[in-house]
Amino acid sequence: MKFLLIASNKDLASKNIANHIKEYFDVFETDKELLSLTAEDLEYADYYIFLSKHKSIANKPSLTVHTPGNLTEDNTFGGNPKEVCPCDAVLNTLLLKNIYKNYKTYYEDGKIGEFDVSFEVVHHSPTGLKAPTVFVEIGSSEKEWILKEAGEIIAKSVLETIDAMKSKNYDKKVRAIGFGGGHYAPKFTKLALEDKYYFGYLVPKYASVSEDVLNQLISKMEVDKALIDWKGCRGDDKRRYIEFFENNGIEWERV
């Protein structure tokens, strides 16, 4: 089981996290922007973990986890339209839970201020990698990107997650795809942190995905169930998604 950790020298948060990991685990470092990387730039691995900054208009301190991909024709931030990378729900959720656990310890010890810890929905490149891919990010401004403690939290969480994956030291739970809600997937983040599910792909309300993309979501991830944020999903999308799940033998549930 090979994990490739990827960092960019052009990304302050990426360098911060990598500096706290390199003593314990090899990191693939590049002078390219992370979002410009393709499969040809990376050696083969069973899992790809990108160490990255997160940017937002609100500039709210945050620690986030998500799989990359373009759910619609919009490929403003690179990659191919309507293409997603493979995803592992266990990997994504263990990362989120470990980040939350370690952040909470640092916060209670007075080592770090308030940060939001959450999933993000599927977005941005790269889209063409052939193994499960995930971004772990520090946001949302330079102040947080270079914060030593934030880098330590992500680094520690990545290493703990790799150890758990390699030893299969994790509970068996339903692996789910989530549909609906906003960019930071609050409902699915909460359910994951409550140990209810392992979440992989998360599709927001604002992305009305096609059948082609739906097929990718169930073929590029091991899926046990689809969960629909009932109040956070458009009516016509709910109908289409449910019809697709039932036609493809995917159990679904409203939450």
Curated annotation (Swiss-Prot):
Cofactor: Zn(2+)
Record's keyword annotation contains Zinc: yes
Enzyme Commission number(s): 3.1.1.96
UniProt keyword terms in alphabetical order: Hydrolase, Metal-binding, Zinc
Catalytic reaction(s) noted: a D-aminoacyl-tRNA + H2O = a tRNA + a D-alpha-amino acid + H(+); glycyl-tRNA(Ala) + H2O = tRNA(Ala) + glycine + H(+)
InterPro entries listed in its UniProt record: Deacylase_DtdA_archaea, DtdA
Enzyme class label: hydrolase
Transmembrane segments: none
Source superkingdom: Archaea
MF annotations from Gene Ontology: D-aminoacyl-tRNA deacylase activity; zinc ion binding
Annotated GO biological process: D-amino acid catabolic process
Free-text cofactor note: Binds 2 Zn(2+) ions per subunit.
Record's function text: D-aminoacyl-tRNA deacylase with broad substrate specificity. By recycling D-aminoacyl-tRNA to D-amino acids and free tRNA molecules, this enzyme counteracts the toxicity associated with the formation of D-aminoacyl-tRNA entities in vivo.
Assembly: Monomer.
Record NCBIfam families: PRK03995.1-3
Family: Belongs to the DtdA deacylase family.
Protein name: D-aminoacyl-tRNA deacylase
Organism in which the protein naturally occurs: Methanocaldococcus jannaschii (strain ATCC 43067 / DSM 2661 / JAL-1 / JCM 10045 / NBRC 100440) (Methanococcus jannaschii)
Biological classification of the source: Archaea, Methanobacteriati, Methanobacteriota, Methanomada group, Methanococci
Gene designation per UniProt: dtdA
